[in-house]
């Protein structure tokens, strides 16, 4: 059973850094629960505001529903007493409901609702999709604005009026006008989090649009650096942010951009580099090439 009401959860999440932990796999690319629990325990030993299990960085797109439920349950059992654990819900409406209900049964605190799978929908369809999931669980729900689920400000407002359990808006598009419209219309009714790849890159400007937090993938392998960066952002310390961007984040982006799909692969590469391997990535993603891993390891050494 969730420890926080949806509104309490929003208050906890909006003023701290959010982590999307990788999902550990063994040599056969099967879920390695023991290693995953160790990774989460390490992640939770730092002051992070929330952990999103089986999300994008956690290769949720490659997990079966049963695997996803197992990953979420393991996360809740391992660290749920100290940090809120949220789960992803995606695919068809029926699948998203199944994911949400399984997460609630496992003791998760909230849901990140991913776009419907490969289905184009107008605003009315998106409203019904989100409403169906919100109505099927008592957990707080965060909608993910990206791909084929671009929620207009009026749509978000209608959903917020209909469902008190809708607590957050995550943006993975980066359309500044769109974000400004949503924040201007909804204000403090929701909390807002950045969800672009390597979200640190955009964190300072998006803070001005109400996005007080973001999903940090690099927190997986450089947690203290990620927390320090977040604190610099919240302090509006442009000098410190720009230094960290130039010294680490932008060189990291250069490695990430060498191969499509490296946004996830490079996170597991980072764990390999610090001796905390979480295994490889599942196809169609590719593991980092040896030279890319060597370059990443050298970069991490500059901030460790």
From Swiss-Prot:
Name of the protein: Probable 5-dehydro-4-deoxyglucarate dehydratase
Keywords from the UniProt entry: Lyase
Chemical reaction(s) catalysed: 5-dehydro-4-deoxy-D-glucarate + H(+) = 2,5-dioxopentanoate + CO2 + H2O
GO biological process: D-glucarate catabolic process
EC numbers, comma separated: 4.2.1.41
One Pfam family recorded for the sequence: DHDPS
Disulfide partners: none
Keyword Lyase among record annotations: yes
Keyword Lyase among record annotations: yes
InterPro entries attached to this UniProt entry: Aldolase_TIM, DapA-like, Dehydro-deoxyglucarate_dehyd
Lineage start: Bacteria, Bacillati, Actinomycetota, Actinomycetes, Micrococcales
């Amino acid at each position: 059973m969730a420890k926080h009401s949806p509104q309490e959860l929003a208050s906890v999440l909006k003023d701290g850094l959010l982590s999307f932990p990788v999902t550990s796999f063994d040599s056969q690319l099967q879920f390695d629960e023991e290693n995953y629990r160790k990774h989460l325990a390490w992640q939770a030993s730092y002051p992070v505001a929330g952990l999103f299990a089986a999300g994008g960085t956690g290769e949720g797109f490659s997990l079966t529903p049963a695997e996803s439920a197992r990953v979420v349950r393991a996360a809740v059992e391992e660290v749920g007493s100290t940090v809120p654990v949220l789960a992803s819900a995606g695919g068809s409406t029926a699948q998203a409901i199944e994911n949400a209900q399984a997460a609630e049964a496992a003791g998760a605190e909230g849901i990140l609702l991913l776009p419907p799978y490969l289905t184009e929908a107008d605003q009315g369809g998106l409203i019904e999709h989100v409403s169906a999931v919100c109505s099927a669980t008592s957990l707080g729900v965060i909608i993910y604005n990206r791909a084929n689920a671009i929620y207009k400000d009026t749509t978000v407002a209608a959903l917020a009026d209909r469902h008190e359990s809708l607590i957050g808006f995550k943006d993975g598009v980066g359309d500044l006008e769109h974000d400004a419209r949503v924040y201007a219309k909804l204000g403090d009714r929701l909390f807002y989090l950045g969800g672009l790849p390597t979200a640190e890159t955009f964190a300072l400007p998006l803070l001005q649009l109400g996005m007080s937090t973001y999903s940090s993938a690099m927190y997986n392998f450089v947690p203290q650096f990620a927390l320090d960066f977040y604190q610099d952002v919240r302090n509006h310390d442009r000098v410190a942010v720009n230094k960290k961007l130039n010294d680490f984040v932008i060189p990291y982006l250069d490695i990430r951009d060498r191969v499509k799909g490296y946004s996830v692969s490079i996170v597991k590469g980072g764990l390999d580099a610090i001796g905390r391997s979480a295994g490889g990535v599942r196809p169609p993603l590719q593991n980092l090439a040896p030279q890319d891993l060597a370059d990443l390891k050298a970069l991490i050494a500059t901030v460790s």
